[in-house]
Regions:
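Conserved short strand/loop->alpha-helix "switch" segment adjacent to the catalytic nucleotide/phosphoryl-transfer site
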Residues: 2, 33-39, 168-192
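Eukaryotic low-complexity, non-globular regulatory regions
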Residues: 32-34, 40-52
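Conserved ATP-binding N-box helix of the HATPase_c
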Residues: 179-256, 319-325
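Flexible, glycine-/charge-rich segments associated with ATP-binding catalytic modules
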Residues: 1-29, 49-56, 60, 78-136, ...
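Acidic ATP/Mg2+-coordinating residue in the GHKL
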Residues: 266
């Protein structure tokens, strides 16, 4: 059984994916997850999506029965709700069978708060997560992310207002910097492009059939970390360490470093598989695509004009994300399929159209490195909040 710890890390995420690749189908999640690592909540969502593809996926609750407070607390959390949506069967702490439908009903109040309630009520530690559950019959797509009847992703302007509200809720009055709120506008462009990409490409499988259970979403986080502790927070991910080392040396920005985190996640076919399915019926999971071809396909998605649609004006979204992140001196992590990629922009830089090469997040190598399979895509962006700077 895969047992996720409260202090979930990206290193553990990779270990758990390896267990899934070996056929493990049982998953146990704690009622409270700290998920302090960068992009950890979104990575948990990807782990859950990958696990949920197993027809024997069984979820074990840390609750004696559905009527317990612990069961309600678990269901009323983004990780708990996503796990219940993906599970094929659910058992209690005692191993007794539990109704998945009844367990999900415990989350109704939480889902309503996620749609149009107070952000303070869905805040978890240092982040706010919104889930879009495409298979839900009611309240599937949050009005904070969708307009109209839930078929159109909100504009970047609307998302900028949402981000300002998130930043205000997440930051304390003592630590809030004016530059943080200034980041809402450029960050909204990143959020729009990334989430729009999930809406267009991540609701179906590699055959373009609608996914029976689909959870997509966004996490907005705020990090306030002592510079001396930054490097240790990177774990074994070498590209993270390189970025944090550069940030830690910038003592002129104060004892503590502040970051805005944006993560967008989905359980779709992944970037490379979306690229191939638009051109030729080659399945990565079936061994039809080499690792090098998968990496090349991901880079094609990131290039200016790269698109899986016939419209020549489309396909600039992921490229714009890299460009905006480079302009702000940020960091990008991309986990999709067999690839774990990252790019550090410790210094603000002019981004060129062909400059999309990334590094393996763990080894730092620019060559393709094989990792355990992960369904869907997680894109995590970190943007530094600088003192005295008008972003």
């Amino acid at each position: 059984m895969i047992q996720v710890r409260k202090s979930f890390t990206l290193d553990q995420f990779e270990d758990h994916l390896s267990s899934l690749a070996e056929g493990e189908s049982r998953l146990s999640l704690p009622n409270l997850i700290k998920a302090e690592a960068v992009g950890a909540t979104a990575s948990l969502m990807q782990l859950i999506a990958t696990w949920g593809r197993n027809p024997d996926a069984q979820l074990k609750l840390y609750a004696p029965e559905l009527g317990s407070v612990s069961a309600a607390n678990f269901a009323s959390s983004p990780v708990g709700l996503a796990a219940l949506n993906a599970a094929r069967s659910v058992v209690s702490q005692n191993g007794e069978s539990v109704s998945r439908r009844a367990a999900m009903m415990l989350a109704e109040r939480y889902v309503r708060e996620m749609h149009d309630g107070r952000l303070e009520d869905i805040k978890a530690a240092n982040s706010i997560t919104l889930l879009s559950m495409d298979n839900a019959h009611h309240l599937g797509r949050p009005v904070r992310l969708y307009s109209g009847a839930g078929e159109t992703v909100r504009s970047a302007r609307d998302l900028a207002d949402f981000l300002r509200n998130c930043f205000t809720v997440l930051m304390t009055s003592e630590t809030r910097l004016p530059a943080a709120l200034d980041l809402a506008e450029p960050a909204s462009g990143i959020l729009f492009e990334a989430f729009q990409n999930t809406h267009e490409h991540a609701r179906t499988n590699w055959k373009k059939d609608e996914l029976p259970r689909s959870t997509r979403g966004v996490t907005v986080g705020w990090r306030y970390v002592e510079r001396a502790r930054l490097v240790d927070a990177a774990g074994h991910h070498r590209v993270f360490r390189k970025y944090f080392e550069a940030v830690a040396e910038d003592e002129g920005q104060g004892r503590n470093a502040q970051f805005i985190e944006l993560s967008v996640f989905d359980g779709g076919p992944g970037l490379a598989q979306s690229w191939f399915r638009a051109r030729e019926p080659r399945n990565i999971r079936h061994g039809d695509v080499t690792l090098e071809e998968e990496l090349t396909a991901v880079y094609a998605c990131l290039q200016k004009g790269g698109t899986t649609k016939g419209n020549n004006s489309a396909g600039n979204g992921l490229y714009r994300i890299l460009r905006l992140t480079s302009e702000r001196g940020g960091f990008v992590r991309l986990r999709t399929g067999r690839l774990s990629l990252a790019r550090s922009f410790a210094e603000s830089t002019l981004f060129k159209p062909a400059d999309v090469e990334m590094e393996d997040a763990v080894t730092g190598s620019t060559a393709a490195q094989r990792h355990a399979w992960a369904d869907g895509t997680v894109l995590t962006i970190m943007l530094p909040v600088r003192r005295g700077a008008r972003q």
